[in-house]
Regions:
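Short, Lys/Arg-enriched, disordered terminal segments
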Residues: 1-2, 121-123
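Long, low-complexity, intrinsically disordered polar/charged segments
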Residues: 1-8, 61-65, 112
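N-terminal, charge-rich interaction modules
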Residues: 1-46
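Short, charged/polar micro-motifs that form catalytic or ligand-binding hotspots
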Residues: 7, 64, 68-69, 93-97
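Gly/Ser/Thr-rich loops at beta-strand to alpha-helix junctions
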Residues: 10-13, 36, 71-74, 98-102
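Helix-rich interaction surfaces within compact, conserved domain-sized segments
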Residues: 13-22, 29, 79-121
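Short, intrinsically disordered low-complexity segments
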Residues: 36-66
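Mid-chain, well-packed structural core segment of small domains
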Residues: 55-85
């Protein structure tokens, strides 16, 4: 079943997102900032490790969602609904074999770097 990991989304957009995902039968998991040092696969699988300390630093200001186990059709439907309902999310990513090993902070850094590189090509 599809799961959407949600990071640092404001209450208004989170409420709208939950309405959309509920209609599409997509599970939403809000990830607390204390889990930001966990690898994404641990968050998805709800596993723990005594070696990983809770995150206690500054939380990125941008919102992020990570699509887990989505079919192309379901992802297209959700992306269309996000546009239609004007749900503002700064970064959208798909869980891959590579990035599932990253922690949340690494994902944010990669997303910020991609956005910066994209903006340079548009300029």
């Amino acid at each position: 079943m599809e799961k959407l990991l949600v990071f640092h989304l404001d209450d208004n957009n989170l409420k709208k997102l939950k309405q959309v995902t509920g209609a599409l039968k997509i599970r939403v998991e809000e990830v607390p900032s204390s889990d930001y040092l966990k690898p994404l696969e641990m968050i998805v699988n709800k596993t723990a490790s005594p070696l990983i300390q809770p995150f206690s630093g500054d939380v990125p200001s941008e919102s992020l969602i990570v699509f887990c186990d989505f079919t192309e059709k379901k992802m297209d439907k959700l992306l269309a609904a996000l546009r239609r309902d004007q749900i503002a999310i700064d970064y959208k990513a798909v869980l891959t074999p590579t990035n599932k090993k990253w922690n949340v902070m690494r994902m944010y850094l990669e997303m910020q770097a991609e956005k910066s590189a994209y903006q340079k090509t548009k300029a």
